[in-house]
Amino acid sequence: MNKKELALGCMRIANLSIEEAEKLITCALDNDVTFFDHADIYGKRKCEEIFGEVLKRNPSFRKRMIIQSKCGICKGYYDFSKEHIITQVKESIRLLNCEYLDILLLHRPDALADINEVNEAFDYLYENGLVKEFGVSNMNSWQIELYNKKLNQKIKHNQIQLSIVHSHIISEGLFVNMSENEACDRSGGIIEYCMLNDIKIQAWSPVMACWADGTFIDNPKYDKLNEKLEELSIKYGVKKNAIAISWILRHPANMIPIVGTTSTTHLLEMVKGLPIYLTREEWYGLYLASGHKLP
């Protein structure tokens, strides 16, 4: 069985002091959470800056970390130009005080992207030791296929939204050849495509229902799901958020949930979901309790 892991999403650490961020990062490392997810737009780069200050104070942390950042989103448009990608990566590395990125993701698709130009940017970053691996976020299988046909540095990661509630990428696989709305293929079979091509899936917002509702944990709109989460949390001796994490980890794609908490308490609660191996009945029970159905 593959090792299960979490990543700490750093989108909200701009609201923390350097001391608070240091406590959170130390807690993560001490509990084998070594993957840290950033983006150039998070906190208008304040998140990267605070993280970098923590690394200045604790230079030994770097060798224990996988640091990922993303670029491409601008105010009102997307930009995958060679100049933009290279400029943003260099600034991320400077602010993060990390010398290189372990992973760079292109942040959502750019409809105007010149993939040959992206290829030049990726080659430059790789050959100059600035980025080790590359990936994308929120792309479907055909988009990744197109990039990988032209890129020398292949796409090895795809970060997509996934939770028990926001799980249409799973539903579309269950409803193959059916007439229900769940059968609509919005991702090009992205889970199966990534598994076939050894592309690691990162699941963002693993405890969120949707932007309008926020988290489904203890949300009265999702009472049946919370009843099931409570039942399983009692059985396994953990909090509901740990069960929500274990639901994602149970999938054979061996995904990495990106948990965007700034609370050490919540982080430690979710870490306890790593060793939990839900039964098929429990996994499908959560899926159904969230309002989904089976064909």
Cite the ranges covered by each PLM segment:
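N-terminal binding-site loop/beta-alpha segment at the start of enzyme catalytic domains
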Residues: M1-M65, E127, A209
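Short, acidic/polar
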Residues: L16-A28, F80-L96, W142-E145
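Beta/alpha (TIM)-barrel catalytic core signal, keyed to glycine-rich beta->alpha loops juxtaposed to Asp/Glu
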Residues: A113-P295
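Hydrophobic faces of well-ordered beta-strands that scaffold small-molecule active sites
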Residues: K4-L8, F36-H38, M65-S69, L104-L106, ...
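A structural motif
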Residues: V33, C98-L101, V131, I155
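Active-site groove signature of glycoside hydrolases
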Residues: I93-D114
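Active-site mouth loops of central-metabolism enzymes
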Residues: G9-E19, C71-E83, L112
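Short, small-residue-enriched loops and turns at beta-alpha junctions
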Residues: A14-N15, G43-K44, C74-K75, R108-A113, ...
